[in-house]
């Protein structure tokens, strides 16, 4: 059953619970099938935001790529694979068939000193500034890279990426599939840097592993941009989005 455009009590209850927990203005929710699919949705949403902004300016779209971190892991579907570490990850053999993204250095560790953070920020800035006209957004696993080696990284670097995303008009995506719901000691890992992403993806603990479900959250402002843009809605409709059994769990 396709639940796109329809609703039911279990889905409403699930998303209202998420809204009550979600940081800041993230009160628009798209239910997806899994963490990887949630990442796919977030990438498409970021691109549609840039399509809408470009259309509003009457320009030509160039912002189609995404900046990700070395050491990252975001899933096993095609778009998600494209933002995983291209060398040290498990997807190197598919590199000729996935979208080519931009990669920033792996951030220094959680307890890094100020000098290491500043060095990383300078290196990241150089890459972001070079590709500023090509980028739609930035995607990170906030504070902790999971499958990429359980690497806890500096909250100061995440705060810096939030600031640069604002300066460059980029969409900041937080992949909290593995870090959300208290797994890092705070409800969401972004809280360690005291930032709110433009888009947040959650999964895993959302259903406790009983059934597959994920969610993509954004603000009403961002959702409205997409609704006013070409297409008039988010161009994604998985068959099992809002599955009532998964939503009830």
Predicted segments, located by residue:
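Conserved N-terminal phosphate-binding loop of PLP-dependent enzymes in the Aspartate aminotransferase
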Residues: 1-249
